[in-house]
Each structure stands twice: as C-alpha cells, then as structure tokens.
C-alpha cells in the first residue's frame, strides 16, 4: 500500500491513537502523536491507523 519499507507485513506499526511517519532519511516508519510536526516525514504526512 505504501512505499518501500522494512516491515514484513501490512499491519499498522504504531499504537492506536498515534500515526506512522516515514522519515525523509529512513525506510522504516516511526510513530508520532497526532500533534507532532510532520515536517520531516515523507510527503509531510503522518498516516493514521484509519488511513493505513
């Protein structure tokens, strides 16, 4: 569904309520709170579980 990642499955990688950010300098997702800045995320977005 998303770009190249190191994840081996398609389950949402974060806890409920958080969102997944793909840092510009990394291929693995990091988890952010919805209030965090997404300036360092691919496409400036943090993907919620609903949108995963």
From Swiss-Prot:
Propeptide part(s) removed at maturation, as residue ranges: 1-6
Organism: Californiconus californicus (California cone)
Subcellular location: Secreted
Domain notes: The cysteine framework is IX (C-C-C-C-C-C).
GO MF annotation list: ion channel regulator activity; toxin activity
Gene Ontology CC annotation, any one: extracellular region
Alphabetized UniProt keyword annotations: Disulfide bond, Ion channel impairing toxin, Neurotoxin, Secreted, Toxin
Stretch forming the signal peptide: none
Taxonomy of the source species: Eukaryota, Metazoa, Spiralia, Lophotrochozoa, Mollusca
Domain of life per record: Eukaryota
Primary subcellular site in the record, as a coarse category: secreted
Coiled-coil zones: none
Disulfide bonds: 14-31, 19-41, 21-46
Name this protein carries in UniProt: Conotoxin Cal9.2d
Membrane-crossing segments per the record: none
Reported function: Probable neurotoxin with unknown target. Possibly targets ion channels.
Expression sites (tissue/organ): Expressed by the venom duct.
